[in-house]
Amino acid sequence: MIFKSSRRQLLALLLAAFAPLSFAQGNELSLLNVSYDPTRELYQAFNPEFSRYWKEKTGQSVTVRQSHGGSGKQARSVIDGLDADVVTLALAYDIDAIAEKSGKLPGDWQKRLPHNASPYASTIVFLVRKGNPKGIKDWDDLVKPGVQVITPNPKTSGGARWNYLAAWGYALKKGGSEAAARDYVSRLLKNVPVLDPAARGATNTFVQRGLGDVLLAWENEAFLSINELGPDKFEIVVPSVSILAEPPVAVVDAVARKRGTETVARAYLEYLYSPLGQKLAARHYYRPIKPELADALDVARFPKVNFIRIDDLGGWQAAQKKHFSDGGSFDQIYGR
């Protein structure tokens, strides 16, 4: 009995040791892409195209599952154990946090893919109701009495952090001082009636529930709202200054290694840079980093924007610490 038990234990250990290898060499693969809220439609289109490409290239079938939510909350879920093969989040800091706090991928993850691992970009625009009844044209109009601004919570939403920094950057550029920027953002937040936990929730609050006069929105969310509900319902206002948002992607090495999906996970992200990946990004209202690969009519939809960049504000590590960490400027302003 002891011998039989030991043999069973040895067999179990061998099976466990070779499970990832067997999984990787089989004909059935699965990936989990943990993403931020507004990428749902993009990856609903992209995933079957990648699966078709991978099947033709390797003979392996791959199923891609999606998880969506506020970018900061999604990063925390991966840190806490959610087995994401890849992450496609709203901002670099959230993937940095996964690397730093969990060790599941290296700190230099941005060097592994082109353009600092950002296959597409976006920006922040204003979505207003048709006819723009409050006459909202630029950031200064958002702090006028009687204007309700909808934006999500920057403690959980990556889009909200881009919104906040776009507003801060505008005020810093116009007012010329940190005090001016802080005063402007303080007045802006007083006009925010509710903070949804994620960007899609904020969009639904504005579009479906009819709350607010203006939505601070990802550009792709604004276009999507007009596409789904019609140009007779909403219109886009492009402010004089906005921020260039560059959502990054990364393989979560420790998970992919454990599940035997490293090769397909890398290929999945690399395919975002392919002609088809860039076409799909533009078709779903993301700015492709290689616009020459996308359809010209899709690229032509994007307005010219006077961009500020995250590096103009010290980079993500500094911005997170200054504004969004516990006790940062957001807590100081909103908690008063």
Please give the residue ranges for each predicted region.
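Short beta-strand->loop
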Residues: V34-Y36, V128-K130, Q148-K174, L188-V192, ...
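Periplasmic-binding protein-like
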Residues: S118-T123, Y184-L189, D196-P197, L229-E262, ...
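Ligand-binding pocket segment of bilobal, Venus flytrap-like solute-binding proteins
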Residues: K174-S240
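Extracellular/periplasmic juxtamembrane helices and adjacent flexible linkers that interface
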Residues: A256-R336
